[in-house]
Every structure is written in C-alpha cells, then in structure tokens.
C-alpha cells in the first residue's frame, strides 16, 4: 500500500461510525478528503455535515452534502478528522493545514472523535512535527518570545492566513511529555487563539491505515 492508499483505507473505515439521519462533524486534510469521498456514498442517508474549514466545506458541497453552521447545531454524534501526530494516549498535534481552531470547536461539540491517519503519524512522543499555534497578528512577537521560554523554537508560517484571519506560529524542537500541561500553558498566553495540541480533547477511536489493513485503537 502507498501512503495515500493507507489514508484512503482509514478514511473509508470511519464510515461505520456515521449514523443514519445524523449531522457529521468533518475535519480537514488529505486523509479527511478520502472520508468525504466515502461520506458522499451515503449522502442521502444523513442530514449533512458541520465542517472545520473552508476547504472541506467546498468539497462537501461539491459532492452534494449539505453543510450546517456550527452555531445551528446543539451537538454532533461523531467528528472525523486526521492528525499530524498522535501518541499512545490518543493525544494529537493538529494544525498542519491551519484549521486547528475550528477543528477544536467541532471536536468540542462532538460526542465521539474518530481520528483517521496512516501509520506514519503514530509516535511515542509528540513534537517532531512542528506544533502550530494560531495567534492574533498583533501578538505574534510577544507569543513567539513566550514560546521560546517554554523551550520551543517558533517560526512564523509565511504567507498563511487562517480562516479566522489570524497567523500561525510553528513551534519546532519540542519534546512534549505532558501534553495537557503544555496545552494549558500555551492557551493561557494573551493573543493565542489556540494551540494545535488536542490533549484535553483527544481521540476516542483511532483508525490507522497500515500496509496490512486498518488497525483500531481506543
């Protein structure tokens, strides 16, 4: 299996968690795009989706799936999204696609978080993938200095504006041994919208596309 074939396998495997008549939370990224393709095969059996990004919204609509505003739903049964890294506790780094804030919001209103990845995303310790932090533009330099104090090496992601109109700092050289504590510390910095650590709201189910098929971790 190629890496993309493993992503596709994980994306299609998530379809079993979608309930008939439901509104489905949909994340962002290359693996999620495969899930959206799968979801389109049962578009007549679901009410629609809540999307975490403009890109996913466009793809959902192109495939004929109705997209609801997050503010118009009280909650979701399931949220399906990928990850840039995920550890053995199902804690994740997300935000490589700059949609981390909206992803956190949709995850927060969902009863179950299904994470879909290929096997290259599984790690023992989070941090080799740069940790994204969404910041309000005027706070960029201040937040960067504070991230250095926390042991990181932040870099401004050039040319990227989030769907919320903000900037991304990617924090390199972090070995994250206490993800919940670091999530709290970074989120407490004035000017931070959110950090791409999904530790307090980790995945409930992990579906991993591997050369020998899809593996499930709970």
Swiss-Prot record:
GO cellular component terms given for this protein: cytosol
Gene3D superfamilies according to UniProt: 3.30.70.260, 3.40.50.1360
Statement: the UniProt record of this protein carries the keyword Isomerase: yes
EC number: 5.3.1.6
Reactions accelerated catalytically: aldehydo-D-ribose 5-phosphate = D-ribulose 5-phosphate
GO molecular function, one term: ribose-5-phosphate isomerase activity
Keyword vocabulary terms for this entry: Isomerase
Gene Ontology process terms (BP): D-ribose metabolic process; pentose-phosphate shunt, non-oxidative branch
Active site residues of this protein: 103 (proton acceptor)
Keyword Mitochondrion: no
Pfam families: Rib_5-P_isom_A
Subunit annotation: Homodimer.
Function: Catalyzes the reversible conversion of ribose-5-phosphate to ribulose 5-phosphate.
Family the UniProt entry places it in: Belongs to the ribose 5-phosphate isomerase family.
The protein, known as: Ribose-5-phosphate isomerase A
Phylogenetic classification of the source organism: Bacteria, Pseudomonadati, Pseudomonadota, Gammaproteobacteria, Vibrionales
């Amino acid at each position: 299996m190629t890496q993309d074939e493993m992503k596709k396998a994980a994306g299609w495997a998530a379809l079993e968690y979608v309930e008939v008549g439901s509104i489905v939370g949909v994340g962002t990224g290359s693996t999620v795009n495969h899930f959206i393709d799968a979801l389109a095969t049962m578009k007549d059996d679901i009410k629609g989706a809540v999307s975490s990004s403009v890109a996913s919204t466009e793809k959902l609509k192109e495939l004929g799936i109705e997209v609801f505003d997050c503010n118009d739903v009280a909650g979701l049964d399931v949220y399906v999204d990928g990850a840039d890294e995920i550890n053995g506790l199902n804690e994740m780094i997300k935000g490589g696609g700059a949609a981390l804030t909206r992803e956190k919001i949709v995850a927060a209103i969902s009863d179950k978080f299904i994470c879909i990845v290929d096997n290259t995303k599984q790690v023992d310790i989070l941090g080799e993938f740069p940790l994204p932090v969404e910041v309000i533009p005027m706070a960029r330099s201040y937040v960067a200095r504070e991230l250095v104090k926390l042991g990181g090496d932040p870099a401004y992601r050039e040319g990227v504006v989030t769907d919320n109109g903000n900037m991304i700092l990617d924090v390199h050289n972090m070995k994250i041994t206490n993800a919940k504590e670091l999530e709290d510390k970074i989120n407490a910095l004035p000017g931070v919208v959110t950090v791409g650590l999904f530790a307090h709201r980790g995945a409930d189910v992990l579906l991993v596309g591997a050369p020998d098929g899809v593996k499930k971790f709970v």
